[in-house]
Amino acid sequence: MESGSVANDSGPLNSTPDVHLYGKTAAMKQRRSNTMLFVFRLLTFSFSLAAVLVMGTNKQKIRSAPQYLEVAWHDFDPFRYVFAVNAIICVYSFVETWLAVYTLSRGTLLLPETFQVWFDYGHDQGFACLLFSANSVGIAMAQLLQSGSTLIQGQYYCSDAGAYCTQARVSIAMGFGAFLFLALSSFLTGLRVARWYLP
């Protein structure tokens, strides 16, 4: 009886991988999660880089000025804030994208699991809030300029500055796109943290 019991313990039933929800193995689910995180990281990087480039090149000539006069993105503090935060997110998401590629290619995390999971989750949360704050301030400034409540150089409207206001709003829209994918990344890293505390 004992030998039969041992034979059953080493039989096909115990060699079958542990199957979880929807019949996916734990390894398959983990790889799918890593792939999704890589896509979200890459999109966050792409949108934040686009926001930086569009805002950083936003310089227009004021056509109705009696002499040559330009308005640039750094003439308004909210637009500086948008540029700076998107630049930070761009660098952060580039590093995280590289880490995601490493995880996908090697099948393991570069850093100790506990440290990297909490590092990713904490920074995703903090940077997502920072990015939302910057874009909210930026869009408020863009609306004030568009409505004429705030004037460029104290006397010129958006229509006098070519595509200045439009380009600023495009940059902010790209920033909100980066926020969306950073928030989705934060959701996935949050699930990784939560799994440690779920029964």
Swiss-Prot record:
What is the protein name for this chain? CASP-like protein 4C1
Question: Which domain of life, per UniProt?
Answer: Eukaryota
Q: Which residues lie on this side of the membrane: Extracellular?
A: 57-80, 146-169
Please tell me whether the keyword Cell membrane is annotated for this protein. Answer: yes
Topology versus the membrane? Multi-pass membrane protein
Report the PANTHER family cross-referenced here.
CASP-LIKE PROTEIN 4A4, CASP-LIKE PROTEIN 4C1
Assembly and partners are described as: Homodimer and heterodimers.
Single GO cellular component term: plasma membrane
Q: Which residues cross the membrane?
A: 36-56, 81-101, 125-145, 170-190
Q: Is-annotated flag, keyword Transmembrane helix? A: yes
- Which terms are listed as keywords in the entry? Cell membrane, Membrane, Transmembrane, Transmembrane helix
* Family membership noted in the UniProt record: Belongs to the Casparian strip membrane proteins (CASP) family.
Q: Which InterPro entries match?
A: CASP/CASPL, CASP_dom
Cytoplasmic-side stretches of the chain, per the record, are: 1-35, 102-124, 191-199
Give the UniProt subcellular location, in the record's own words. Cell membrane
Q: What organism is this sequence from?
A: Physcomitrium patens (Spreading-leaved earth moss)
Q: Name one Pfam family in it.
A: CASP_dom
> What is the taxonomic lineage of the source species?
Eukaryota, Viridiplantae, Streptophyta, Embryophyta, Bryophyta
